[in-house]
């Protein structure tokens, strides 16, 4: 049985504080931090809840946006042993562009031997799998149209090839833990259902 605790989301819930972003703590066969939000707030809220993140086995960063991986450096400072899983290309420079205004929304690159760049679906064991590459049969969210990444000397629409999700098998059930689902939630569900029929 897995227990999922939301450490960060947009709306605060007393006594926890909120910020734009997401961070979840999954306790089960493995203890996994899924996304960090944009700052150290995930750790502050975990402390309020009595959760010891120093004992987490792993961290997963769903994609290369500040509101999901901005606290990665802080996590690695409070946990000196957890492996970190992040999609290949997640540290590319990313921007939101609206009304000709360009705003950086990427995450600072972190270099460590503990960081594992995920290039394809990766079983972690104990019923946990990192899923990558989702196809596009169902299209993607309209909100993606303002999101770009650096390529050469310019910007191109973000392909979200770095996006990863966590799939948890629990008996006959399959649970999908995702960040923003920039690849499209229906595409993600279809990919998971093909891997876990």
Whereabouts are the PLM-identified features?
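Short hydrophobic-aromatic micro-motifs
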Residues: 32-34, 124-133, 175-178
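Active-site metal-binding motif and surrounding structural segment of the metallo-beta-lactamase
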Residues: 41-92, 193-197
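Metallo-beta-lactamase
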Residues: 90-164
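Pre-active-site segment of Zn-dependent metallo-hydrolases
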Residues: 30-58, 142, 149-151, 185-195
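Active-site-proximal loop/helix segments of hydrolase catalytic cores
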Residues: 155-197
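Conserved beta-strand hairpin/beta-sheet module of binuclear metal-dependent hydrolase folds
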Residues: 2-49, 159-177
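Active-site metal-binding loops of divalent metal-dependent hydrolases
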Residues: 8-11, 36-39, 64, 89-90, ...
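Short, charged, surface-exposed secondary-structure boundary motifs
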Residues: 66, 94-97, 186
């Amino acid at each position: 049985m897995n227990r999922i605790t939301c450490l960060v989301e947009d709306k605060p819930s007393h006594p926890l504080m909120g910020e734009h972003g997401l961070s979840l703590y999954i306790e089960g066969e493995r203890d996994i931090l899924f996304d960090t939000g944009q700052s150290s707030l995930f750790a502050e809220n975990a402390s309020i809840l009595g959760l010891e993140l120093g004992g987490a086995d792993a961290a997963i960063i769903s994609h290369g946006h500040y509101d999901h991986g901005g606290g990665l450096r802080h996590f690695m400072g409070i946990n000196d042993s957890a492996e970190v899983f992040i999609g290949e290309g997640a540290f590319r420079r990313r921007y939101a562009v609206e009304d000709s205004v360009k705003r950086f929304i990427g995450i600072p690159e972190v270099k460590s031997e503990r960081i594992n760049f995920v290039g394809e679906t990766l079983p972690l064991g104990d019923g946990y799998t990192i899923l990558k590459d989702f196809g596009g049969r169902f299209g993607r969210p309209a909100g993606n149209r303002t999101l770009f990444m650096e390529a050469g000397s310019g910007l191109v629409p973000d392909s979200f090839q770095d996006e990863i999700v966590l799939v948890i098998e629990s008996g006959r059930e399959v649970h999908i833990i995702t960040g923003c689902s920039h690849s499209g939630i229906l595409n993600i569900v279809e990919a998971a259902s093909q891997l876990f029929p």
